Amino acid sequence: MSNVKQVLTIAGSDSGGGAGIQADLKTFQMRGVFGTSAITAVTAQNTLGVFDIHPIPLKTIQAQLEAVKNDFQIASCKIGMLGNAEIIECVADFLADKPFGTLVLDPVMIAKGGAPLLQRQAVSALSQKLLPLADVITPNIPEAEALTGIAIVDDISIQQAAKALQKQGAKNVIIKGGHSLNSQSELCQDWVLLADGRHFTLQSPRFNTPHTHGTGCTFSACLTAELAKGEPLQSAVKTAKDFITAAISHPLNIGQGHGPTNHWAYSRL
């Protein structure tokens, strides 16, 4: 398998295994790419919540990135939890010359249980430093609102937010609809704005389950894997949508709270 594609995740570690680095590597494995990692923070968490966050020293983050760069041919890279402005600036400076191919930015801000994973003052650093480097950004609705200052209440405002993210530098925008504009809707709709101005939506059934921990990480990791394999963005987004839909709709029922998704589900359909 000398032609296996190599990818990188830059994110936090989740001791509960449902999100972050752990979810990314599981997804990479299931999608047939070789995953490498640079850990930005170690979190103590499980399905019930986040109990401690320990940011990794900047020199250690940079050393991880250097180690990956010097030995692997990374076709695409995803960024997840960064935690604070200093880490954002460290990562952005390293990625300035795009050493890791296509860059997918998942602007992780809040854990599924509500715990903040990005300091409030770091949002502007994310907008100014990383958005201009992103080939694709994958915020959910609350994250898109935080990055743009636009209250997303309908289809018009979600389009405005997507265009605002493009103006900040992101080339392609995917606003995920898990946090529905209509809480009674039976559908989950993602809104996609491509670099050339075309846009489309992707729909899936909405499932009444608490086991959605790590959905954003898993979606963006699958997208990263498909882009590494050379899939066009529209096709890659569709695969990522199908992958996470399968993962949510076949829950593992692990833990006492917001449990993880099922990374095996898509391959077993």
Curated annotation (Swiss-Prot):
Group of enzyme by EC: transferase
Pfam families found in the cross-reference section: Phos_pyr_kin (PF08543)
Protein name: Hydroxymethylpyrimidine/phosphomethylpyrimidine kinase
Gene Ontology molecular functions: ATP binding; hydroxymethylpyrimidine kinase activity; phosphomethylpyrimidine kinase activity
Function text: Catalyzes the phosphorylation of hydroxymethylpyrimidine phosphate (HMP-P) to HMP-PP, and of HMP to HMP-P.
CDD domains: HMPP_kinase (cd01169)
Highest taxon listed in the record's lineage: Bacteria
EC number: 2.7.1.49, 2.7.4.7
Gene Ontology BP terms: thiamine biosynthetic process; thiamine diphosphate biosynthetic process
Binding site for 4-amino-5-hydroxymethyl-2-methylpyrimidine: 45
